[in-house]
Amino acid sequence: MKKIDEKLGVEFKNRKYIEEALTHPSKSKNNYQRLEFLGDSILDFLVGEYLFKKSDKSEGDLTVLRAHFVSEEYLSECFDKLDVESELNLGKSLQGKVTRAIKGDVFEAIIGAIYLEKGIDFTRNFIIEKLNLENFENVENDNYKSELQELVQANFK
C-alpha cells in the first residue's frame, strides 16, 4: 500500500484518481479540477443527507450547518488533519505556498477520487469520520434569519 493510501485509509487500485486529486493545475493539465467538481457535489449531498437524517432542525438551520461543514475554511482544516500536504504535486510557483483555498479544493478532489474508487457507502463513512459530522450539535448556529423569524412569531401572534 502506498503512503498516501495509508494516510487516507483507502487503497487505490486505480492510481490515476488519487494522483489527479493531488495535482494542482499549475503542474499538469491532468489535475484535480474535475475531481474537485465531483467531490464538491458529493460532499453537499452526503453532508445534507446526514444532517437531514440525524437532526430535526429547520431547513434554514440545516442549510447553515451544511454550509459550515463544506466551507473552504473547514475543509482546509480537515485537509490538514489528513497530513497529505507533502504528497501534493504543485507547480514551481506554488512550492511552499499551499493556500486554504487549495487545501479545500484538494480535499474535495480526494472525496471525488474516493467515490470513483470505492463507491458511495465507503465515501459516506469517510466523510462522516473526517468531517466529524457526528458532532454537528456542537456547531455554532449563525442562522439569524430563523432566529429573527422565531422571535417575531413568538412576540407578535
Please state what every model-predicted region is:
Residues 1-157:
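Double-stranded RNA-binding/processing signature
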